[in-house]
Curated annotation (Swiss-Prot):
GO terms for cellular component: plasma membrane. It comes from Bacillus subtilis (strain 168). Signal peptide: none annotated. It is found in: Cell membrane. This is Uncharacterized MFS-type transporter YdeG. Belongs to the major facilitator superfamily. The lineage of its organism: Bacteria, Bacillati, Bacillota, Bacilli, Bacillales. Pfam families: MFS_1.
């Protein structure tokens, strides 16, 4: 196929632009900062879309079906949707760059939210469940966006870059639920069921996140990182050395994934059953909300400090800290009197903090252990495992409490978190 002069000129300009970053550390640094800014802005919208929808998903299903029996299905559906979407967003990002993968993921999540609104209007449970599955794409993209800021970061900046995007997610995640009543009133004013109101916010927020990334994430950080890495490759004997590096990279991926999967299982399991445990001991919804609020705050707000610690003290030290913190959380939750608000707040705050340590150190390990040729695809695969482990943790937690007790669940979770230590120690061996 022949290209016209304008097409050839455009390709030449793009190539020259990419090449300019190879020889200019200042331009690389500037793009790194710009990428962090753009991703952080998108995460504010993404967090709002995630939290607003999650808040009322179960209530919409309950209202449509007239029973509590399937109220947990919305959470399961968008978790499954998130798992599948994580794989797709990772593949798209690997092939076309972060800009395409992330913007597409958020926009698809927005379409899912619109589908939920339509389902509420026409009272279609089938459309609701399909739409919730699609809505899960926003959840997956919100999580994967944390990787975009690391593409141009050096080894000592990667955890800090992840932590910055997580803090900005908090702003949206806090704003979303606080606007539930406002959006419910707005929905009624335009003839939409009030419970669909938060999904109006979710649709707008996810679409805005996608637009911000599509317009502003230029040049694409993963494409630039790939160009720089290719330019810096030196020809030579890659036989034994390459095989050794591949083994080490594979080990790092296994450890990073294990850290995040285990922390996700433990966190989701204990968090899911804590409100039920509290209600059984006479706490009202306000008290439950307070404990969960402290928990969510501890999951995200310490991120900036955690990122600095992971970069300075090392991934291994903070992964071990994650395991010990989760153990402490499990022990306190297990033996705290059911009537003690203070001890439950402490336990759930430590649970959130341990998860924070694990996610940031595990993410940094994944980034350290991959190159630009496979990074986005590998990250997407790991996020599938995280999503599925969260779903498994939530499902198993109810079974354990039903078959035994909240005490047993908390102790099992705490002990399970200790598996992080031998896994991390193994990773240090040759």
């Amino acid at each position: 196929m022949m290209l016209d002069k304008d097409s050839v000129k455009a390709i030449d300009v793009q190539t020259a632009s990419l090449q300019s970053y190879i020889s200019s550390p200042e331009k690389q640094k500037s793009l790194y900062k710009r990428t962090l800014f753009v991703v952080s802005i998108s995460q504010i919208f993404g967090g709002a879309g995630l939290a607003a929808g999650v808040t009322v998903g179960a209530l919409i299903a309950q209202q449509m079906l007239g029973t509590d029996a399937f109220a947990g299905l919305p959470s399961a559906l968008f978790t499954l949707g998130s798992a599948g979407s994580a794989l797709i967003v990772g593949r798209l990002s690997q092939r076309y760059g972060r800009r395409t993968g992330l913007s597409a993921g958020f926009m698809i999540g927005g379409l899912g939210a619109i589908g939920v609104i339509m389902a509420a209007i026409i009272n279609s449970i089938f459309l609701l469940f399909i739409s919730l599955l699609i809505y899960g794409a926003g959840t997956a993209t919100n999580l994967q966006a944390r990787y975009a800021g690391t593409d141009l970061a050096n080894h000592k900046q990667r955890a800090t870059a992840v932590s910055i995007t997580m803090v900005f997610t908090t702003f949206g995640a806090v704003a979303g639920p606080s606007l539930v009543n406002v959006m419910g009133d707005f929905a009624l004013s335009i003839g939409v069921p009030s419970l669909a109101g938060p999904f109006i916010l979710a649709a707008a927020a996810y679409m805005l996140a996608g637009v911000v990334l599509f317009i502003m994430l230029r040049p694409d950080p993963l494409v630039i990182a790939r160009t720089i890495e290719a330019a810096n490759e030196e020809p030579g004997d890659k036989g034994h050395l390459a095989a050794t590096e591949h083994t080490e990279n594979k080990k790092g991926i296994i450890v990073g994934a294990t850290v995040m999967v285990l922390t996700q299982i433990v966190m989701v399991a204990i968090m899911t059953m804590t409100p039920v445990h509290m209600r059984h001991h006479g706490h009202d919804l306000g008290a439950v909300g307070l404990v969960i609020g402290f928990h969510i705050g501890a999951m995200y707000l310490p991120s900036l400090v955690t990122g600095v610690l992971v970069d300075r003290l090392g991934r291994t030290a903070m992964a071990i800290s994650s395991g010990t913190t989760l153990l402490l959380a499990g022990v306190i939750a297990a033996f705290a009197p059911g009537e003690s608000m203070i001890l439950l707040v402490i336990a759930l705050s430590l649970l959130g903090l341990g998860w924070n340590f694990g996610l940031i150190s595990g993410t940094a390990l994944i980034v350290d252990s991959t190159d630009t040729a496979t990074r986005a695809k590998t990250q997407g695969t790991v996020d599938v495992l995280i999503a599925l482990s969260g779903a498994a943790g939530g499902a198993l937690s109810g079974m354990i409490v039903a078959g035994s007790s909240y005490l047993a669940l908390s102790l099992i979770g705490g002990i399970l978190s200790l598996l992080l230590i031998p896994v991390v120690v193994w990773s240090r061996g040759r």
